[in-house]
Amino acid sequence: MVRKAVIPVAGLGTRVLPASKAIPKEMLPVVDKPAIQLVIEEAVQAGIKDIILVTRSGKEAIENHFDKHYEIEAELARKGKTAILESVQNILPDDVTLMAIRQPEAKGLGHAVLCASAAVGNEPFAVLLPDVLVDCEDGEVHDLSQMIENFTQESATQVMVERVADEDISKYGIADCS
């Protein structure tokens, strides 16, 4: 069973400048949550228990978001704002661990995943890219859950790809699916 996820978050966010100049792109809001939280929520829903962020300096806001914030929690409790207090306290379930590993230098996505190898060990794991959010069409089975199920049944590596226009090929990693 896949219980670990590696989430590379060490990028510079150049595709979303100027929005990412002062805020990590993974922390940009999608309605009322940062994008990284949506990615981690999908991972948790799929059964992931160990989340490994591969990060760099300047990305501390990501780790801070998933940490306890006692001052905010105390203030919300004092004001009786229980609904928002619960949402703040439940950002990361108690049975899920989150760790951060630094990528010492920018050598690309493959290197970022390699930086997590000691934490992953010899276990199967998922790599989640937090700058691409995919909405579930049927509203029930999320892509990661389906990929983990396929991996468990087939014992074969799973890769999700998306078609892009020819003029956008230089912006993405490319897979030839022919």
Where would I find each of the regions flagged by the language model?
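N-terminal glycine-rich phosphate-binding loop and ensuing alpha1 helix
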Residues: 2-81, 98, 103, 139-146
